[in-house]
Curated annotation (Swiss-Prot):
Source species: Saccharomyces cerevisiae (strain ATCC 204508 / S288c)
InterPro entries hit by this protein: AIM11 (IPR038814)
UniProt KW keywords: Membrane, Mitochondrion, Transmembrane, Transmembrane helix
Protein name, entry field: Uncharacterized protein YBL059W
Residue intervals passing through the bilayer: 119-143
Note: Present with 623 molecules/cell in log phase SD medium.
Domain of life according to the entry: Eukaryota
GO CC, alphabetical: mitochondrial membrane; mitochondrion
Membrane disposition: Single-pass membrane protein
Span of the signal peptide: none
Length: 193
């Protein structure tokens, strides 16, 4: 069976601890957070066997995942900044050099194709700016919620809509505490290297 537990530790960031408990070789099932009391009852006689390599592998995957989320956010931020800069250039009024006897209110004559091109460019710049701002909001929220896929986002939004409580601050049983302690110990030793 797979146990999916979430626990705050070491500088108050959450990490998803995945450990495999061998209760029955033929039966493997992923438990959700709402199944937590059932997991504790079922897994009392099981001993989690997690090697330091698995923990290190998990921590590396977690760091890659967070780096990917950060890269997405900063990529869309750079896109937004570029489109905002283009939109600013489009909004600057065209300066027309005046002749000696020309009135200040006389406008420059433009062809229809030039006007259509400037309108199309302005529309594209405004669309890019709007998409960039919404993209920054979405990727920033996903980065802060630690969401990397649409399925995870759906689960997170369902939890928030149902007001389910998170078990991060609840006391753990002895074996789960051993797993968390081994993760903390391995994480601290990997920082010292």
């Amino acid at each position: 069976m797979l146990l999916d537990a979430q626990r705050f530790f070491n500088r108050s960031f959450s990490i998803n601890v995945i450990c495999e408990l061998k209760h029955n070789v033929n039966t493997r099932r992923k438990f959700e957070i709402k199944d937590w009391p059932t997991i504790m009852l079922v897994s009392r006689n099981d001993k989690p066997k997690i090697s330091s390599e698995e923990v290190t592998h998990f921590i590396d995957d977690y760091k890659k995942r967070r780096k990917t989320q950060m890269t997405r956010f900063f990529g869309i931020t750079i896109f937004t900044l570029i489109t905002c800069r283009i939109a600013m250039k489009k909004m600057i009024t065209a300066k027309v050099p005046l002749n000696t006897f020309q009135a200040n209110y006389a406008s420059r004559t433009q062809t229809i194709t030039h006007t259509q091109k400037s309108l199309a460019g302005s529309l594209l710049a405004a669309t890019g700016m709007t998409l960039g701002i919404f993209g920054m909001g979405i990727t920033g929220t996903c980065w802060s919620w630690d969401v990397s896929s649409f399925q995870e986002l759906k689960q997170r939004l369902e939890r928030r809509a149902n007001n389910e409580f998170v078990v991060t601050n609840m006391p753990l049983d002895k074996r789960s505490q051993q797993v968390v302690d081994s993760l903390v110990k391995t994480h601290n030793s990997s920082l010292c290297k």
